[in-house]
Amino acid sequence: MTHKQDAIPQIAILLGYSGASPFVALAILSILFEEPFFIEGLIVYAAIILSFLGGIYWGAAMKNLSQNEFTASLKTDLSISVTPALLAWGILVIKNLKVAIIFLSVGFLAQLIVDVVATKNGYFPHWYNALRIPLTAIVLLCLIVAYIYYEPLQI
């Protein structure tokens, strides 16, 4: 039985899955059309979303900040918040698209682990994992599909 506080807000479901739709569309397009454009689009979108997921920690840290106390916990939260963005930025300069997909997949998996632990420790609402886990599964599946089907042009 789910308590009301454990239920995922409908708007979070709507926006979360809407945010996953470009992953699905770009993965499908990358299969249908053998153009690097769709894989590149998938990589850029994945980098943006990975950055967004890290940024959630910045917002949460600012909300929890009281009287400008820069505790060790706050420093950790702020560090966690920028790490995915820095990783994503580095990935965007990788020329080998398959390598970029591998690094993005690792980044999403690592971020999910951090989020699951943070939620279990009460940092996020109880429902957050119930939303994040399936969304991350969709993202990883799309990245795996793109990795499998993408064949770089041999010149």
Predicted regions and their residues:
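Short, amphipathic, aromatic/basic-enriched membrane-interface segments that mark the entry/exit
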Residues: 5-12, 61-78, 123-129
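The first (N-terminal) embedded transmembrane alpha-helix
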Residues: 9-30, 136-143
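Core segments of alpha-helical transmembrane spans in multipass integral membrane proteins
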Residues: 17-24, 43-65, 72-90
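Alpha-helical transmembrane segments of multipass membrane proteins
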Residues: 24-28, 86-93, 116, 144
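Alpha-helical transmembrane segments and their membrane-interface exit regions
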Residues: 48-54, 106-117
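Transmembrane helix-loop-helix
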Residues: 92-110
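Interfacial loop-to-transmembrane junctions
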Residues: 114, 118-140
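Juxtamembrane boundary at the C-terminal end of a transmembrane helix
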Residues: 145-155
